[in-house]
Amino acid sequence: MIKVLFVCHGNICRSTMAQYVMQDLVTRHGLAEHFYINSAATSMEEIGNPVHRGTRAKLKEVGIPCGDHRAVQMQRSDYDKYDYIIGMDSWNCRNMMRILGKDPEGKVSLLLDYTDHPRDIADPWYTGNFDATYDDVKAGCEALLTHIQETEGRK
């Protein structure tokens, strides 16, 4: 079982979008039984809140259900629970390391680091552009899945 945790600031926009996009990808590839995919926040600001309406609307538009997710905060213990801990931007990664303390196994990375265009994914909470965020998240999740298939296939 490959365990992936997507992380952003509040766990209501980007990380949740990545969680559901990745779940859709592995399901469509017939790999769902090999993956456990979740998401979390670095902050406590949105804990308990549902998926942002903009994220929910974009996922619905592309035919991806997003369930009844509620925001949770990342914990230090998550390091031992997940194989991949994926941040949406550099600020998230700094805060993830503050929570985790260290990354001896190299589990922490940015989602778009798996693409040919590594960079931060803009937060639609501020930009209002859920289309651009979805495009980045989709590209990142597709590249991450390819990376996992190539890496895990060699083990």
Predicted regions and their residues:
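Phosphate-binding/catalytic loops
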Residues: 78, 84, 90-155
